[in-house]
Amino acid sequence: MLTLEKIYKASEVLKEVAGKTDILPASKIFCDNHIFLKTENIQSTGSFKVRGAYFKISELTEEEKKRGVIACSAGNHAQGVALAATKHGVKSLICLPEGAPISKIQATKGYGADVCLVKGVYDDAYQKALELKEQYGYTFVHPFDDEDVIAGQGTVALEILEDMPKVDAI
């Protein structure tokens, strides 16, 4: 079960790779509430996804790290896993659908991952990643349905609560 303690642990681990981002008012959104935006787009990979990937890989055993990791993505998670794996000295293979933006594919390769382009859509890339995981013994880094990934991504909420303790909703 995910605990607040684990999210705090992730926050400490992530100081190595994810900077604390600003919260800015969304002045162009007109509604009855005050809306703020967290500028996760300025993270090294352009999104918050590096947080979950980095913490997940940091929690792997040495044996799991030796075997490498695999993930599927349409872009942002791919870059997060690629960078996180490279920083940990872990081999990574990312399955992306052929239609993924070329900029995402190039960035993923640039962060050190091997890329497997899969004919079809995201679901096809997901299935291919699961097949390769079984075939080669990689650890699968799920983009959202994983306790360690959620803990890493949950550090965004800690930062929001630190900067805006009276926030009504996140």
Name each region found by the language model:
Residues 1-170:
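PLP-dependent amino-acid enzyme catalytic core
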